[in-house]
């Protein structure tokens, strides 16, 4: 597998565009991804009991059609908690886009992100849609889906399947309300592989638990967010089938793209200065390892310690202890940046200057060794700063 300098439109047969329609005052806020032919599609959606109208529309269409031609997205207005009118507006958003592309409405996915409780300004949407073009600027799409993010989040890779080259690309947004299960973000992945929707869903479902569901910024789960994958077969490879070496290769490709997007989201948490990675190793099973890792990275006390560049092993061990996992914790090793701070559940002395250098970096890795098995799990998050409170205190409702 090779990482390339690409966009969401790098896979064959895809294009994208983004622009400023007026959902936000100045920044880009409207865009689409278009496949030149019907693409296999798979999705995972928020687990919040309050589900935004666009998710209802998209989830229904994915289940009904099993194929997709385009995804249209606005940012600035979430169209969540907007009742019957909000649902009607989401369907209208889908229908207008379908009319413009000359396809059936169920072939269109819709997504919205932004302020909850506001109806979509439909004149703004209609005006923006009239200006979107096929084969537009894919980098502008990556900008158009952002809310409080400080940077775009994209990744693109290629892999060979026999004599054919398959390209996969991803783009995401997410900065606050990040505690997916699956939730709190928008992620879109395009691919030109020949793979059915059912097989694509299998690959997505298998990998979401190890990637997007292992990030946390603030523990809040959004009403709006989802991950959609489209694969249109333009690479002309032999169909990828389950339980084959080709499926395993495709799954690893998808896992890499999803993991890179997840890390970019965690690193861009609201007010964040540092990316935190927690590796739990030698656990009795992978699920326990992932639960412990997410417990540590989600701890507000651990987050604030990392912000203050304090190697507070006590907070880390406490988060391990309340993770809800029945694993002995009387023989735990904890390393920060590879430097031991606890061995066999007892603190050890360490070089203060070496630790200071580790804690001062913009990425901090915490390793928890349980000595209870051979499985591992990883989670990602960010530190918790003064700016997080400031950003969310000033955010408009």
UniProtKB/Swiss-Prot annotation:
Positions marked as site (Involved in the stabilization of negative charge on the oxyanion by the formation of the oxyanion hole): 113-114
Pathway where it operates: Amino-acid biosynthesis; L-arginine biosynthesis; L-ornithine and N-acetyl-L-glutamate from L-glutamate and N(2)-acetyl-L-ornithine (cyclic): step 1/1; Amino-acid biosynthesis; L-arginine biosynthesis; N(2)-acetyl-L-ornithine from L-glutamate: step 1/4
Annotated site location: Cleavage: 183-184
Location in the cell: Cytoplasm
MF term (GO), any: L-glutamate N-acetyltransferase activity
Claim: Amino-acid biosynthesis is one of the keywords in the record: yes
Function, as annotated: Catalyzes two activities which are involved in the cyclic version of arginine biosynthesis: the synthesis of N-acetylglutamate from glutamate and acetyl-CoA as the acetyl donor, and of ornithine by transacetylation between N(2)-acetylornithine and glutamate.
Subunit structure of this chain's protein: Heterotetramer of two alpha and two beta chains.
Designated name of the protein: Arginine biosynthesis bifunctional protein ArgJ
Native organism: Streptococcus thermophilus (strain ATCC BAA-250 / LMG 18311)
Source organism phylogeny: Bacteria, Bacillati, Bacillota, Bacilli, Lactobacillales
